[in-house]
């Protein structure tokens, strides 16, 4: 397997972060409401992983190194895993294992609906992130996986609705996300390899 060391580093890093958070919760180091802190951190971790996933293609075009693409799918699947953990923590710590509370939560916090829409889209990408699905779907596979851009928008909207007045951190993620989208515009994406060539010549 090519770039096994890079894949291993991603695996260990993505696994270590939630494990550390759980340990912090165990020793009561997450403040007065550790459950909510876990929910928030897992959601933010999923957004960071989504941004990292989207950054792999521009990085490959700029550097010419295929290792970035080698871990792109892995990062995307870890993003989905973090979202699953985010939802699980929400069910345990916010709903108290009571689905009956979900209706009340939805009426008070409609941003949950936005988050669920993002989860459904991400689920579709996760179950089709394999060669079998690529062969079966053919040209439709790429069209389906463009949902990642919608997922980013939903994720940022979900976070914006959650943080409300505290916009400083959200703005940082929004700027990074918007920059990654700009790098995918055909007129800009075509120039990225040229930048690498010019840098190599100079």
From Swiss-Prot:
Signal peptide: none
Localization of this protein: Cell inner membrane
Pfam families: Ferric_reduct (PF01794)
Major location (coarse): membrane
InterPro entries: Fe3_Rdtase_TM_dom, MsrQ-like
Biological processes, Gene Ontology terms: protein repair
Quaternary state and interactors: Heterodimer of a catalytic subunit (MsrP) and a heme-binding subunit (MsrQ).
Biological role stated in the UniProt entry: Part of the MsrPQ system that repairs oxidized periplasmic proteins containing methionine sulfoxide residues (Met-O), using respiratory chain electrons. Thus protects these proteins from oxidative-stress damage caused by reactive species of oxygen and chlorine generated by the host defense mechanisms. MsrPQ is essential for the maintenance of envelope integrity under bleach stress, rescuing a wide series of structurally unrelated periplasmic proteins from methionine oxidation.
Protein family according to the UniProt entry: Belongs to the MsrQ family.
Record-given protein name: Protein-methionine-sulfoxide reductase heme-binding subunit MsrQ
Organism this protein belongs to: Pseudomonas aeruginosa (strain ATCC 15692 / DSM 22644 / CIP 104116 / JCM 14847 / LMG 12228 / 1C / PRS 101 / PAO1)
Gene designation: msrQ
């Amino acid at each position: 397997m090519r770039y096994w060391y890079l894949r291993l580093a991603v695996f260990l890093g993505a696994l270590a972060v939630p494990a550390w958070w759980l340990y912090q919760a165990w020793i009561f180091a997450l403040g007065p409401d550790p459950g909510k802190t876990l929910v928030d951190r897992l959601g933010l971790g999923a957004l960071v992983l989504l941004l990292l996933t989207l950054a792999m293609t521009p990085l490959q075009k700029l550097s010419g190194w295929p290792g970035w693409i080698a871990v792109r799918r892995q990062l995307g699947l870890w993003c989905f895993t973090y979202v699953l953990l985010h939802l699980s923590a929400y069910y345990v710590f916010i709903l108290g294992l009571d689905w009956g509370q979900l209706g009340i939560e939805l009426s008070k916090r409609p941003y949950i609906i936005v988050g669920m829409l993002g989860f459904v889209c991400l689920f579709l990408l996760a179950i089709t992130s394999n060669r079998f699905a690529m062969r079966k779907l053919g040209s439709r596979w790429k069209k389906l996986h463009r949902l990642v851009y919608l997922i980013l928008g939903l994720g940022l909207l979900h976070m914006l609705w959650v943080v409300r007045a505290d916009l400083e951190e959200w703005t940082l993620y929004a700027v990074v996300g918007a920059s990654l989208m700009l790098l995918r515009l055909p007129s800009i994406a075509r120039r990225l390899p040229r930048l690498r060539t010019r840098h190599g010549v100079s």
